[in-house]
A protein has these predicted regions:
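Exported/extracytosolic protein signature
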Residues: 25-28, 37-44, 56-58
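Short, solvent-exposed beta-strand/turn "edge" segments of beta-rich domains on protein surfaces
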Residues: 17-27, 34-36, 109-116, 459-462
Length: 638
């Protein structure tokens, strides 16, 4: 979004977005070129929305040929340099990410008449698979008509593309303007509306381009054990098996019915819950808990999801009337008690998956109020036996707490905006976790050949998602990399093997001028930093937290990315004008569920399985791979 004092006198002569996805790694550049045609100085705001979780890695600015470039520094060092520049009377400004969701990069510049200015922001992210699709979302909000407008997205996927789809997110106004060119492993998406096409109406001076440009796609999957991609000393293992029977699930819905849920939020929650209950499978077991200052159970134990029980649960949900306070601690402990009791009594299928889904819109006001104590109580009660998923409705809830408690218990959290879309958002989240296909997934690699492997042990795999593991690999002394994945399916203990030539991708990558030759390193760093951020969030001691912080800082500096512990200094060549870009201290960012780090290898006696593979159960089904070879403000007065 470009904001100025006098809209009519600022010309936007170019607004360009270029994004290249190489094996799920999206590098995005947003560039705006403007000129101040007014007879006085103008205040220009460059405000760009960046996807939550993306890493900003570069920002440059050019003002009448004067270039400003960026570098990453440790946060306190960067702030010190910024303060020194400001104290000496040098031009200085602050660029801050939005403290709420970390989604905005914003700089404000005061430019004299006739000035030409160019902003350019670069960031990268890993595109995660949800509901059987990768969705790349780019915020395109130029704020005004642009003489040249372009959104250009290229997709390079060595696995091959199943489909590419661009929903009409800007509305019918832009029907037929987006072009899609799709090959076997590459695709090109282009959106180039003329100035006339950008107008809201033929005589309007405002732009209709205001929203998210979305590209959806999926890749081909020929192997059960996943896809290994090896390049430039790193490997990435993409794992998304299909055509498996769902595991039965034992699910407890814990719903906040305190007074703050009154009105639209409760109405939408009831609507969502009725739809979710209808989707339970016959093999599932479930119950409902609603809580305010008191805790009530629809059933004191799990019941089978028969049509009669589901219908009765819907009627119960319909009778809820929000009032009173919020006793989160008691509600979660009651839920864990029901699941633990069912397990102790042998009522749960050994191959089933147990989970709690908490829906709340506020902090505790009754019972235990200390968040760290609630987190400790829930952790001790769950005992790593099942998963906790948290939905935080609106902005009064402490979303950071929900993320900590979910991550600590093999789950994840999501913010739900308390509006007319609440029901759809809740159903969308449930659909992501409604179909567990595997449990106890363990990735194994030869220890003498790999190092610095990211999280390799996962509690569950849900249909439509994808598990990604990365690490460093010694390609100098290795011709092939082998992986063995073990997991529990509905009817078998699986052992899945994958073997890849370490040079298999070399030719493909060198032939494509758009592919990022650094994609494996960036994906490994992205996963590693996010994993450490999650690990730090739940670190039990201050000493461990400090050590993790040091590691995150070093990774951030090594890979030139803005994280909670680094800042971006933006300055001109003479170093007499400086800006500081940083993030708030505590990021509200979720990460990787499950155990962090490599699980120590256990001895195994399975014939045909390498000694380094951590296979503790005798395989019922051995599935080898089947594959044919192949700124507050910055004032500039010049």
């Amino acid at each position: 979004q470009l904001q100025v004092e006098d809209d009519d006198k600022i010309g936007l002569y170019s607004y360009k977005v270029q994004s290249t996805i190489t094996s799920r790694l999206a590098n995005t550049m947003i560039q705006a070129k403007m000129v101040n045609n007014a007879k006085r100085s103008q205040h220009i705001v460059f405000d760009v929305q960046v996807p939550k979780g993306a890493f900003i890695d570069n920002f440059t600015m050019d003002v009448n040929g004067i270039s400003f470039t960026s570098k990453i520094r440790e946060k306190s060092e960067a702030r010190k340099m910024y303060s020194q520049a400001k104290a000496k009377g040098k031009a200085a400004g602050i660029v801050r990410s939005n403290a709420l969701d970390m989604e905005n990069f914003k700089t404000e510049v005061n430019v004299p008449p006739g000035t030409r200015i160019q902003f350019e922001l670069h960031y990268h992210e890993m595109i995660r698979r949800k509901l059987s699709s990768y969705e790349h979302v780019i915020s395109v909000k130029p704020g005004r008509l642009a003489k040249h407008m372009e959104v250009d997205v290229r997709i390079i996927e060595p696995q091959g593309l199943r489909y590419v789809h661009v929903p009409n997110s800007f509305g019918d106004h832009f029907d037929g303007i987006t072009t899609i060119s799709k090959g076997e492993k590459k695709a090109h998406v282009s959106f180039k509306p003329t100035m006339a096409q950008q107008r809201k109406c033929p005589t309007c001076s405002s732009t209709a381009v205001d929203g998210n440009f979305v590209v959806q796609y999926d890749v081909n999957r020929e192997t059960t054990g996943g896809e290994l991609e090896i390049f430039n000393g790193y490997f990435i293992h993409f794992f998304a098996p299909e055509n498996l029977d769902p595991l039965p699930k034992n699910i407890l819905f814990v719903i906040d019915v305190s007074g703050s849920m009154w009105g639209l939020k409760m109405k939408q929650t009831i609507e969502a819950m009725k739809a979710i209950l209808s989707e339970l499978r016959a093999a599932d077991q479930f119950s409902l808990i609603d809580f305010n200052h008191n805790v009530r159970c629809w059933r004191d134990n799990l019941v089978s999801a028969t049509p009669a029980q589901v219908e009765d649960a819907k009627k119960y949900i319909q009778t809820i009337h929000p009032n009173g306070g919020t006793n989160i601690n008691e509600a979660l402990l009651r839920a864990t008690f029901i699941l633990n009791e069912a397990q102790n009594l042998g009522m749960l299928d050994p191959n089933s998956v147990s989970m709690i889904v908490l829906v709340s819109d506020g902090d505790p006001t009754v019972g235990e109020l200390k968040l760290t104590t609630i987190q400790k109580n829930v952790k001790q009660s769950i005992k790593d036996e099942f998963s906790l998923f948290c939905l935080g409705i609106g902005f009064d809830v402490d979303y950071d707490f929900l993320q900590r408690i979910a991550t600590d218990n093999r789950g994840m959290a999501q913010r739900i905006f308390g509006n007319q879309e609440t029901s759809a958002q809740m159903k969308n989240f449930y659909n992501q976790v409604s179909t567990p296909l595997l449990k106890k997934i363990q990735f194994n690699y030869p220890q003498e050949s790999v190092s610095d492997v990211t999280q390799s042990s996962f509690h569950n795999y849900f249909g439509g998602s994808e598990i990604v593991v990365a690490g460093k690999v010694d390609t100098e002394n290795l011709q092939h990399l082998e992986s063995i994945v073990t997991a529990t399916a509905a009817n078998a203990e699986l052992v899945m093997e994958t073997l890849r030539d370490v040079e298999e991708l070399d030719g493909f990558m060198k032939k494509d001028r758009y592919a990022d030759p650094d994609f494996t390193r960036k994906l490994w760093a992205y996963l590693t930093v996010n994993q450490m951020l999650a690990e730090r969030n739940t670190a039990p001691t201050a000493a461990l937290k400090r050590n993790i912080t040091k590691s995150i800082l070093q990774m951030s500096l090594d890979h030139h990315i803005v994280t909670p512990f680094t800042a971006m200094l933006i300055e001109n060549a003479e170093k007499d004008e400086i800006m500081l870009a940083d993030q708030p201290k505590d990021p509200r960012r979720g990460c990787c569920p499950g155990t962090l780090g490599l699980t120590p290898n256990a001895p195994n006696n399975n014939k045909g399985i390498p000694a380094w593979a951590n296979v503790t159960a005798v395989p019922v089904s051995f599935m080898p791979e089947q594959r044919s070879p192949p700124v507050s403000s910055l004032s500039i007065n010049r």
